[in-house]
């Protein structure tokens, strides 16, 4: 069976501030019981749900509007999706006071802009009627709203610039983990909106949202026949269980996801995260003029472009798709990478080619512990560049950049194989490896993971990565997580507070996703 890496081309290079919308309706499923025989909750779930979402866990101020049709096959529509990143370039990294000030200045204007993108009351009423007709029902809220759309506003609408628009059914927001003050900015705003609109609040876990992002992408794209071969009648992918490699500037975790709220951490970082390690290595490796001219502090992304300057075409060539419509990185980019075939090869030191004379050691090369450690290689990179000084040529810097990323990414992969060896039962259910978080946008990482999975006997495992705009922090993933938690019957108390640390693993100090106080079952 041919190995695959799923990434939806529609999202590959699209700017973040575009509005993404699906355009096809659902096929008619089996008839539902008449509306007068259903509970209020069943009737609510028979219509399209809409949420406004806020993400402020670090230095990105993000707002999104997302809707989803009823049921597990409901279509997803992203009406608004924007973010503003604080400018911390003068500090060489994220500077909390600057990030907080940016949230204070940016969040309200973004929300005001998002409200103008709310679906009109008439448009949503038509959508509700279509959903009800498809379910075998009739009448109800949709028809009534359609009649009233041009008249006085009702409890289900907001008047924005004189136009009746659908009011969100609930507000979603990041509760943690993250910077406490930054989280509080978003949570306070979300509480205010939920109170003013008299709708529920969904305060969700940031890492859970990263893990669920591919399901959001599946729900958004599976209805568009021009970009996806998947049918609107298929379940949202990936289906549980699956493995998730969460890689960002703040976290590095290998997670076994068994359900919406059941996630077990198999391996995690002992110190800094892989994204932080890449940023720090980039500060030492990249030429000073390149660092000075870069417009933000995402130096890890700049390191990839520096290491592989020919690997960034404006758009992927059409021939880069395989027979399933998935992108084949072997065809897209020639990294000249040969994966280690055995453990003895993956723990061998990297010796720089002549005329260079330095060595890099793989992280934890002398240990089989289920953990990640990125400090050691960072120290070696710093020593190499310090000893060379200004005499280090561009070619040597590029060689060091490639070797550094290679060893970091192989380290990520080795813990996957060690975890599978420690729990053979995981091999039987492993069909999908999700890679999510900011570092997942690194194409060389995807190439290394795919190659290593293939040579270790896992060609059948689908490697799924969100498009770059959804790898980094964003509010769309928060909206989707809120949507899934809401449909599962959960909501948050208005008394919830930020969680600086909040593990998704139930064995953690916080007790997992549902272990923190404030969750409650929605009333029917």
Task: Label each residue range with its predicted role.
Residues 1-49:
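N-terminal mitochondrial targeting presequence
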Residues 47-167, 173-177:
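N-terminal beta-alpha supersecondary unit
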Residues 60-67, 212, 244-246, 252-256:
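Short beta-strand scaffold segments in enzyme catalytic cores
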Residues 142-159, 305-433, 442-454, 514-524:
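A contiguous, well-structured pocket-lining segment that forms one wall/lid of small-molecule binding clefts
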Residues 173-199, 217, 443-453:
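Short Gly/Thr/Asp-enriched flexible loops that form oxyanion-binding sites at enzyme active sites
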Residues 199, 204-242:
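Conserved phosphate-binding catalytic cores of ATP/NTP-utilizing and phosphoryl-transfer enzymes
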Residues 203-204, 432, 449-478, 492-496:
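Conserved phosphate-binding/catalytic loops in two-lobed NTP-binding clefts
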Residues 485-524:
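Acidic, glycine/GT-rich loop-and beta-edge segments that sit at the periphery of enzyme/chaperone cores
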